[in-house]
Amino acid sequence: MNLVQDKVTIITGGTRGIGFAAAKIFIDNGAKVSIFGETQEEVDTALAQLKELYPEEEVLGFAPDLTSRDAVMAAVGQVAQKYGRLDVMINNAGITSNNVFSRVSEEEFKHIMDINVTGVFNGAWCAYQCMKDAKKGVIINTASVTGIFGSLSGVGYPASKASVIGLTHGLGREIIRKNIRVVGVAPGVVNTDMTNGNPPEIMEGYLKALPMKRMLEPEEIANVYLFLASDLASGITATTVSVDGAYRP
């Protein structure tokens, strides 16, 4: 059974990690996938990889500035115009920082909030414009377990992810009247380039705090996105699902 057959789906941060895993799993399940990435070069590389894996599938790719509503709307609009609708929006793009509080500059904090919060807000806002008249759709926002429990360092990242959780719950309650569901996913420690780019001492701390004694794989998170985007999750909205292997920062 293809859980998202013919569902028009956009995945931000879709060129690597969780987003790229989601792109593959959604294609495997019949979705019409478009990916957003940070640069056109990254997008083109990911598109080439997907073309090799799925030569019969047409996957669109864009590199809009997620902090610009106009730029995001232009890209989202191209997808909706091509297919006549938008069914699923996965706001997955994000950045991290582990600077301790005393070393976080105003510019660094603002940048994290711009990408992780404003980017999600813009993605959700633009998706809503394409879904409201059809009165159906699913918006999935990537949060983090650190947005629930905090972290030992790097206040900007958990602050931004807590904001994503609040945005998700509030928006989910507001627009369910339009039959549009909004759900958050809060991953724990996932085996991605972003995670593995942390300093060795932070990676060591992660592994000690993992009851499963391993990091989660991107596909384990993407499978939850797949379920939430499907009709099997028709009663789930305005909440955040933790996929963390019992990890507590």
UniProtKB/Swiss-Prot annotation:
Pathway named in the protein's UniProt entry: Lipid metabolism; bile acid biosynthesis
Keywords tagged on the record: Lipid metabolism, NAD, Oxidoreductase, Steroid metabolism
Gene Ontology molecular function, alphabetical: 3alpha-hydroxy bile acid-CoA-ester 3-dehydrogenase activity; bile acid binding; NAD+ binding; oxidoreductase activity, acting on the CH-OH group of donors, NAD or NADP as acceptor; steroid dehydrogenase activity, acting on the CH-OH group of donors, NAD or NADP as acceptor
Keyword Disulfide bond among UniProt keywords: no
Annotated binding of NAD(+), by residue: T15, R16, G17, I18, E38, E42, N92, K161, V190, N191, T192
InterPro entries for the chain: NAD(P)-bd_dom_sf, Sc_DH/Rdtase_CS, SDR, SDR_fam
EC number: 1.1.1.395
pH dependence remark: The direction of reaction is pH dependent in vitro. At pH 7.3, clearly the reduction reaction is preferred with an order of magnitude higher velocity than the oxidation reaction. At pH 8.7, the velocities of the oxidation and reduction reaction are comparable. At pH 9.9 the velocity of the reduction reaction is about 60% of oxidation reaction.
Annotated consequence of substituting E42A: Improves utilization of NADP(+) as cosubstrate by 10-fold compared to wild-type. Displays 6-fold increase in affinity for NADP(+)
Pfam families on file: adh_short
Entry's Gene Ontology BP terms: bile acid biosynthetic process; bile acid catabolic process; bile acid metabolic process; protein homotetramerization; response to bile acid
Entry's induction text: Induced by the C24 primary bile acids cholic acid (CA) and chenodeoxycholic acid (CDCA).
Residue numbers binding substrate: S144
Highest taxon above the source species: Bacteria
CC annotations in GO: cytoplasm
Coiled-coil positions: none
Reaction catalyzed: a 3alpha-hydroxy bile acid CoA + NAD(+) = a 3-oxo bile acid CoA + NADH + H(+); choloyl-CoA + NAD(+) = 7alpha,12alpha-dihydroxy-3-oxochol-24-oyl-CoA + NADH + H(+); chenodeoxycholoyl-CoA + NAD(+) = 7alpha-hydroxy-3-oxochol-24-oyl-CoA + NADH + H(+); deoxycholoyl-CoA + NAD(+) = 12alpha-hydroxy-3-oxocholan-24-oyl-CoA + NADH + H(+)
Active site, renumbered: Y157, K161
Chain's role: Involved in the multi-step bile acid 7alpha-dehydroxylation pathway that transforms primary bile acids to secondary bile acids in the human gut. Catalyzes the oxidation of C3-hydroxyl group of CoA conjugated bile acids generating a C3-oxo bile acid intermediate. Can use choloyl-CoA, chenodeoxycholoyl-CoA, deoxycholoyl-CoA, and lithocholoyl-CoA as substrates with similar efficiency. Highly prefers NAD over NADP as cosubstrate. Also catalyzes the reverse reactions; in vitro, the preferred direction of reaction depends on the pH.
PANTHER family (UniProt xref): 3-OXOACYL-(ACYL-CARRIER-PROTEIN) REDUCTASE, 3-OXOACYL-[ACYL-CARRIER-PROTEIN] REDUCTASE FABG
Further details from the record: There are three genes for BaiA proteins: baiA1 is identical to baiA3 and encodes a polypeptide sharing 92% identity with baiA2 gene product.
Similarity remark: Belongs to the short-chain dehydrogenases/reductases (SDR) family.
Subunit structure, interactors included: Homotetramer.
Protein name stated in the entry: 3alpha-hydroxy bile acid-CoA-ester 3-dehydrogenase 2
Organism: Clostridium scindens (strain JCM 10418 / VPI 12708)
